[in-house]
Amino acid sequence: MAKDLNDSGFPPKRKPLLRPQRSDFTANSSTTMNVNANTRGRGRQKQEGGKGSSRSPSLHSPKSWIRSASATGILGLRRPELAHSHSHAPSTGTPAGGNRSPLRRSTANATPVETGRSLTDGDINNVVDVLPSFEMYNTLHRHIPQGNVDPDRHDFPPSYQEANNSTATGAAGSSADLSHQSLSTDALGATRSSSTSNLENLIPLRTEHHSIAAHQSTAVDEDSLDIPPILDDLNDTDNIFIDKLYTLPKMSTPIEITIKTTKHAPIPHVKPEEESILKEYTSGDLIHGFITIENKSQANLKFEMFYVTLESYISIIDKVKSKRTIKRFLRMVDLSASWSYSKIALGSGVDFIPADVDYDGSVFGLNNSRVLEPGVKYKKFFIFKLPLQLLDVTCKQEHFSHCLLPPSFGIDKYRNNCKYSGIKVNRVLGCGHLGTKGSPILTNDMSDDNLSINYTIDARIVGKDQKASKLYIMKEREYNLRVIPFGFDANVVGERTTMSQLNDITKLVQERLDALRKIFQRLEKKEPITNRDIHGADLSGTIDDSIESDSQEILQRKLDQLHIKNRNNYLVNYNDLKLGHDLDNGRSGNSGHNTDTSRAWGPFVESELKYKLKNKSNSSSFLNFSHFLNSSSSSMSSSSNAGKNNHDLTGNKERTGLILVKAKIPKQGLPYWAPSLLRKTNVFESKSKHDQENWVRLSELIPEDVKKPLEKLDLQLTCIESDNSLPHDPPEIQSITTELICITAKSDNSIPIKLNSELLMNKEKLTSIKALYDDFHSKICEYETKFNKNFLELNELYNMNRGDRRPKELKFTDFITSQLFNDIESICNLKVSVHNLSNIFKKQVSTLKQHSKHALSEDSISHTGNGSSSSPSSASLTPVTSSSKSSLFLPSGSSSTSLKFTDQIVHKWVRIAPLQYKRDINVNLEFNKDIKETLIPSFESCLCCRFYCVRVMIKFENHLGVAKIDIPISVRQVTK
């Protein structure tokens, strides 16, 4: 039986890691994590005597806070109104005047406590969202405490202080010999770095490169040397960072772990209602559940640590390079669910008694001895709260869109020895899974087998081989979640354009290559190498050769300056915002023929179509509008007839001109679309009370005009006739069709710039950019080889004029850092896939609204103006009409449909100037009912992105051609 934490104690010769404030402290006391942290500090002062106390820099440095570490709350800090309501709740078996919480179960019996109200969907949802202290996280969960093997080893609380540069340098290496660092990628494609940072640059999540070759199992962390581990007085040889938990070997042990999610917070001695396998979580939702651990053997099994985490990662497979890249962008540790010496209050507020027996025979908690007894099933409750956004340090380049939660995308078919590789999409249901809870859900979201974004709840038991003194994973289990984040807009005010970011990186790379060429010229001439040669022209005159300067640090500051410019508050012209100027030329075009109109339209895209028609007959009208009207009327303006006589004298028998198509980039977005089975399971009514309140609260943050789903696109056609062309009516539209374009991009290194659909759809431009960076990559590799070959000679020239000063090493990373090299590789390895979906939207005729004839007539009159007016001022609003009996687009005899189509969608040409006409088009966007694809929300992360465009194709009569325009739109989940 598990050891009750209320008993006298802890194992012999072992002291509790969380020291009590009072001598009568018991495990059932409800204390805050910050109190525990302060207590540890006092305990450490006692041990060290007169050394004095050192305050942790993390308490004063917001950058060091682990904001997403856990959703674990503190019962003592619960809302006052909740505590007040609980204080009046009846409790059986509690003495009068007792101070027992109504949420605690009495030890006298095993029946649930009566609180006077439902705990499943009421007060339990008032979760206290208080984060644990940094010291507690670092002590308990960043390091795995040792001592189970050696009973004489004590895990004393550490003291925290900033690491000195000398300490970090000494730890890296003590050799005084000059050594250079190579940037060449090894067999796994990972780069090495020697850059350092201080304690404030806490980046707990990293990108890993794994080999998928059969003969290799190496895992390389591309950031492992960029960000040194957090230093404290713990012996690193006796502890392991949680960041390296994924590299531990796995052993087969007779331990069974089960993970189950529940609709509400589990209550002791009450059977919970399990959550559906098709549940979709969104930003701010609570994830409740419990974990059971059972030793199936006949002997005791010792373990070192037990972790319960909510993790998210991106997996990219490169079969050509036999490489698997993993980017972990979220890891939340539930301190109350993981093992610790003391009981930590649950974030849900539900209390339990350690070592008590639940309704299913399981024992609450894990004992302090860290021993799994045979035949005993242990249970731990967990609760996680999905964040609204990620930590700022998630993206090195500081892109806001990279710090938003991406949606679940594809499935990781290479995890756990390809455990999920057999999952296929059911054509009828539109999704597929293994049929067991915890299985990932595969939908037709246009992802390939080599790219996935995954959310999992992971439980891991870490053990230690007593003979080899090596840590290993005794057992691990994952529970896959489907997460569709709330539709926050990733386009922020003041964000720089894609091309401006790319140009800055290009200039920096060219400057670094110029510096390398300069030192090689110095090498040929045997001339001394100065700091000016290394730092480039922009720092000439500011860096003196006598000054001790760190070249790598200077280059890193240049990169940091580029990243600072990526922030959304960089040089915002608020006057332009008021005028409606376009802030992102990378996403939209600027019309040169009408600046005022461009300001009124705001962000827009445009395309053009040149047309050329031969003269077929002497008819006064070659093109007509009866295609939609099915009527036989004929009229032309007197100005057109007069112009015809003048143009006939030139002898030109052709009609030529230019059609410009311009479209607004809408603020609204298309709604997230999932298979019907998922939609029915995740309706608003099926959510818990907390999740419903969370959804309403998030919806209030979105403006009403943005919250409304995108239902139509506004286009404007401008027809400009050539000066030497025969007079003619502007071309008539034969048909309008729409299709949805899905653009997916990925790279196995962090993408340094913010991408957009226009760049990814422009194959010619993207190819030229990749060719340029391929050239950069080859030159860097060439220069690195030459640098390594002449390493000693270059350092002699660099230290030639240093005199009596200590020699200083010149490294290749002084010119090209690993981060800059990764940026170049990322652009070189950028891959784009495009899917054209033609069956997403209904045909335009099927979207027509039913209006009365009176309303229809008024709409037509108000749009075209009074055509009978002959004054010059009204001539600019004169609609152009002509005659024909063509009906290629609409069924014959549907004159009412033709009128509605003209009035609601295509409207009529309006003459606005000599030889210039304008026409407004409203393209309706309505989903078909039988969509088989899943439209996940638009997103952009460090390794991959998904964008959408609506392609509108306007086909003109008489084989004139088709005008195409791709309008960037977003897909969001903002409505239920």
From Swiss-Prot:
Q: Which organism is it from?
A: Saccharomyces cerevisiae (strain ATCC 204508 / S288c)
Q: What is this protein called?
A: Ubiquitin ligase-binding protein BUL1
| Pfam families linked | Bul1_C, Bul1_N
Q: What does this protein do?
A: Component of a RSP5 ubiquitin ligase complex which specifies polyubiquitination and intracellular trafficking of the general amino acid permease GAP1 as well as other permeases such as PMA1. The RSP5-BUL1/2 complex is also necessary for the heat-shock element (HSE)-mediated gene expression, nitrogen starvation GLN3-dependent transcription and pressure-induced differential regulation of the 2 tryptophan permeases TAT1 and TAT2.
For biological process, the GO terms are: ATP export; mitochondrion inheritance; positive regulation of ubiquitin-dependent endocytosis; protein monoubiquitination; protein polyubiquitination; response to glucose; ubiquitin-dependent endocytosis; ubiquitin-dependent protein catabolic process via the multivesicular body sorting pathway
Q: Where does motif PY-motif map?
A: 156-160
Q: Where does this protein act, in terms of pathway? A: Protein modification; protein ubiquitination
UniProt region (Disordered), positions on chain: 1-65, 82-124, 145-196, 857-878
The coding gene here is BUL1
Cystine residue pairs? none
Impact of changing P158A on the protein?
Abolishes interaction with RSP5 and reduces HSE-mediated gene expression
The record's comment about this protein's domains reads:
The PY-motif is required for the interaction with RSP5 ubiquitin-ligase and the HSE-mediated gene expression.
* Family annotation (InterPro entries): Bul1-like, Bul1_C, Bul1_N
What binding partners and quaternary form does the record give? Component of the RSP5-BUL1/2 ubiquitin ligase complex composed of at least RSP5 and BUL1 or BUL2.
Q: Which GO terms describe its cellular component?
A: cytoplasm; RSP5-BUL ubiquitin ligase complex; ubiquitin ligase complex
List GO molecular-function terms, semicolon-separated. ubiquitin-ubiquitin ligase activity
Instruction: Tell me which UniProt keywords the record has, alphabetically.
Output: Cytoplasm, Phosphoprotein, Repeat, Ubl conjugation pathway
User: Where are stretches of biased composition, namely Polar residues?
Assistant: 23-39, 177-196
Where does it localize? Cytoplasm
Anything further noted? Answer: Present with 486 molecules/cell in log phase SD medium.
Q: Which residues carry this modification: Phosphoserine?
A: S58, S70
UniProt record similarity statement? Belongs to the BUL1 family.
